[in-house]
């Protein structure tokens, strides 16, 4: 098997195990067997760190069921291959070149060298950040829910936020309410925002930061592009939300709501305000942000910030009539440009076609369905409230999109198709008019 096929199969196996565990009577509060479709949808959503749900996580699932969901989020967020290699390393067995190559593809690392060390860094950093996040959230939740329940909620939401999953346990207040009851708690909002950004920015960027500290000039081109693009994609949407969506209330409330919505829309799926109250332009902007998603080698899904940046730079190159796509005094390879174009095409076709099909099947407005499909393929988890009422056909479509968005479109294609043979000759070149 190729590395791409191993990645696909490993995610399939994790989803299957999660589905079977969630079907057990002990996983539901009613101690009844959960249907296979509902259990599988939840397992796919958790493994693919999305957050779309058909059963409210707090009121339907028992403590055991919630623990299974959290396990799927943790392994799915860090990567099945990452966790697998860590287990192999802990057992004292040697990690061969094939396993290293698979890990490289799994996290989009630039080279095989140092991949084992990077695996340890990913696991250690993830667990440390999640524990810090849980400790910071504990005062809020323990004060509201008591010590035992508060600690569990702190751990659950810290991992869910860092892994950009968007699963929450606040259905105890109102089903599918997410973090709306904490919309005015600036402290909690900031902690969740920082956890989301930390998980969505990518482990490769954090490795660069850990290695070179504040010496940004020594960062890799990818890290520079990711940091710059992420900053732009946080600030600009936040400004739009501030001036056009949250144009009432105090400055402090408008600022934190705008910033939270900008950050969570691209990757996480938490919400502190009513999304259905947004106008169509705001909904359209959120769809674009969800399609872009997080960064390469992160816990998030979507097209990725680096892909968006390469596409933008390619357009600038064409408009300025230059030959090479450039950024930070470096040339970007033609292969990266072609791959970015292919990813954009696959995501647009998949999300738009799926939205049309769901709209026809469910007899729902197209924009509402496009919001749902972009949320699924971007592994975000935001919804306008239609997920639980969808038919089996629409749910299957969403599951496919979630899986597509988590493992990556190119990974799926490369896993399905045989490797292309190298060609020693090239066909004659002929121009074709575009634009």
Regions found by a protein language model. Give the residues of each.
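Membrane-proximal intracellular helices of multi-pass ion channels
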Residues: 1-435
